[in-house]
Amino acid sequence: SEWFKSVNRVKQQLPDSVTTVELFKYAAPLVTKLGDGHTMLRFPFNDYFTSSTIRLPLFLNVKSDYTLRVRGCIDNLIPQDAEVLSINGKESRELIESMMDYASGERDFFRIERINSDFSALFEMMYAADKYDVVYRMKDSKKKLEVTLHPTTWAELLPRMPKKKEQARVPDYSFKVDEKKKVAVMDFRSFNNPQRMKMFADSMFVTLREKGIKNLIIDLRNNGGGNSMVGDVLFRYISPKPFKQMGKALVRVTPTTIRLTGRTQMVPGWSFYNDESKGNFIPPLTKEEGHYEGSVYLLISHHTFSSAGSFAWAFKEFGMGTVIGEESGGMNVSFGDIIYYKLPVSGLS
């Protein structure tokens, strides 16, 4: 296949000895070619960024329209939210497109989300220089401005960055009620801890019933996934019918899978599971048990991924309410759970 041809080409290009960053540069594009957001090679941040590493003193947000917006700059030389047009002659679109080889995902807009997280590291790996000539323009302006930035260490950079307000840690899930508008908004950030979700959901829906709140907005726009069982807990309160997030699965177990997971009871081979029979569906709660009888709206974005993506498609499939927003980051036919492991020599994970 074309993928194995790519593997062979990389093998031929590899020198006898490489650093972890160099190995990442060779190997990550091969992993990206698989086209799956759950299958990725992580950048070796700790190996690359040390106390003596000098870096571009500019932090950027990567947007889905292939533009770059300033998040922060040394001495505030480029104001926040200004648009960076080019760095050392490389236009923003060219920079982003060149990094796509290192961003795993099914859809380009989700891969850009990945680049947004790793932009500083990928930029240093690919475009490190002695100085950086930056062309930018202010928000809502067409006038091009220029500034030259010089790389600095983190210790020098940090005290010279614009001060930000300290932000409190955002909980995995929270809610607030607007009693005048009779609406509640659940801020759902992570699919974590099914037992805690049960306690949270009980409390939230009791509050909504007591206050007569008939409209619930579930905000899933900043949710990258987690444990799908958390979604099942919440679904029991809002689904009008029995539901299931996953219908069928094709499972392959290899000796490598067994070694990496430590699940020695697994048997190598292929298995097919069909859970679409009605007996395997999860029943919603009854009204007496606390089922929510109001209208539910689900907000999603390109960042809605993994367990959050499966939550979104099950929400729509079983008629739980109205979905509003952008296409989610994952696909409803996808790889299943993930296995974390480190390569034995390089330590890349």
Regions found by a protein language model. Give the residues of each.
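Conserved acidic, small-residue-rich alpha-beta core segments centered on
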Residues: A82, S228-S349
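Flexible, low-complexity junctional segments that flank or bridge functional domains
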Residues: S1-L216, L220-L250, N332, G336-L343
